[in-house]
Amino acid sequence: MCDRNSQRKIYMLIAIMKKKILFLCTGNSCRSQMAEGWTKFLKKDEIDAYSAGIETHGLNPYAVKVMAEKGVDMSNHESTNVKDLLHIDFDYVITVCGHANENCPIFPGQAKIIHVGFDDPPKMAEKFENEGKKLDCYRKVRDEIKMFIENELDSLL
């Protein structure tokens, strides 16, 4: 049995060992938010996940809805500008869209920049008027991001 001081040291060591990852996209409204949500849901003990955008476009309600369908609550997420997170010493910055990859700022420290592109759900959905078909576009990308977090993320780190 560990005493309180030993437990505190163990928790501090675990916190130090956790990787800090930023998921970056254009507006921090959809893809990067989904990636942050899935990472916190699936790998909270291994990774401190953040998301941001080159700009802030507000949280996409369709993204919130389809993530909630899988038990991931993003209702309290906010759209964050990457400039507000430059003080954090990230281990990895993962760009999830081409615009963010091309305009990724320079991060202090040793952050490794990785690009893993996903389709843009709002752009895919704009050709549909039917709500169900729009949501299907978001579900497709939601599921692709989940597969990436579950099956490929660890191999990149």
Per-region residue spans from a language model:
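Glycine-rich nucleotide phosphate-binding loop and flanking beta-alpha elements
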Residues: 74, 100-103
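Short glycine-rich anion-binding loops that position phosphate/pyrophosphate groups of nucleotides
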Residues: 27-29, 98-101
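N-terminal amphipathic/basic-hydrophobic helices that include classical n-h-c signal peptides
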Residues: 1-16
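Conserved active-site segments centered on acidic
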Residues: 13-84
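Residues at the C-termini of beta-strands that transition into short coil/loop
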Residues: 53, 97, 117-119
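Phosphate-binding/catalytic loops
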Residues: 103-157
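Conserved acidic residues
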Residues: 91
